[in-house]
Amino acid sequence: MIALIRKNLRLWGYGKSLALFAGCILFSISGRLNGGIAYERHILSAVSDHYYLTYFVLPIVLLSCFSFIDDDGEPVILRFQSYHSYFLKKWIGVGLIAVILTAVQTGAILLSGIGLPLGNEWNLAAGATEAELFSTLEQLFASPLQAFVCFTLYQLIGSWLIFGICMWIGHFTGRKWTIRIVIVLYVLSAVWIKLPAIQNIPLTSFNHLLILHHNFGEPARPWITGFTLLLFMLTIMFSVRFAWRGHLPQLRLKCHGIAAYYSYELMTKRNILILLAVVVGITLYKGLGYGAAE
């Protein structure tokens, strides 16, 4: 599993995390231009910025998926004894990428607020751009710092879930169709907050998994997101366990790994018949040659 994690990290690279850090710094510092805001409220405003999350963070998360969306070769899969074991361990492993992205963002946001006065209260100046959102969050969280922690953890889990969903889509449809499906889902996420007609439809897209306050619009919205996510998880688990990789040969090997894989590939009926024909041919040739010599 460690080797698989290293491979996916190498495929992913660290350029996206650097881009996230730079973009997050720019977005966060621009939020300081309003002035008159405490440190805790500043970091909460940065981590909950709809435009930053929708048009910058979400594309980076989706682009990260395509670094490891393809299945590994059969020799790698056979090391895990079953396909569902391979998929689950790969999904758990790419969680490290979600942790790195979240840690980079958190570090950038915390750095951007250096120098601001401390004030872990909800009192906000009238007319502030965050007033509408903060008035909603004030009813759910005891302090801005608590809300910041919850938003960060939700984004971490949401990124990991998006990775798994994209991997699942990628297996069934292939990279070409996965790109099209992901683009459609992203467009739906991007226009969701702009079109009230779409908000009234009980749909769950990437934005609901990544942005916590997108689940606060309607009383039933958290239930819709939770039910859809549960349905997705059950579908993924069922398909991984019973339906996935049905076209591959079901190997029943006492040992697993590269040696077992190549033994299976070499010991086919065709190869065995060829081997027997060669042995019989050599035997007959030697026998006939020995008889002629006598």
Language model feature labels by segment:
Residues 1-68, 171-172, 176-177, 190-214, ...:
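Hydrophobic alpha-helical transmembrane segments
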Residues 25-67, 88-175, 207-227, 291-293:
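Secretory targeting signals
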Residues 72-73, 168:
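A residue-level signal for alpha-helical anchor/packing sites in multi-pass solute transporters
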Residues 77-84:
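Short helix-to-coil transition segments within interhelical loops
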Residues 85, 177-178:
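Residue-level recognition of membrane-helix boundary sites in multi-pass small-molecule transporters
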Residues 89, 181-182:
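Hydrophobic core positions of alpha-helical segments in small-molecule transporters
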Residues 117-129, 187-204:
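Juxtamembrane non-transmembrane "cap" segments at the membrane-aqueous interface
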Residues 144-145, 152, 183-194, 293-294:
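Nucleotide-cofactor and metal-assisted catalytic machinery
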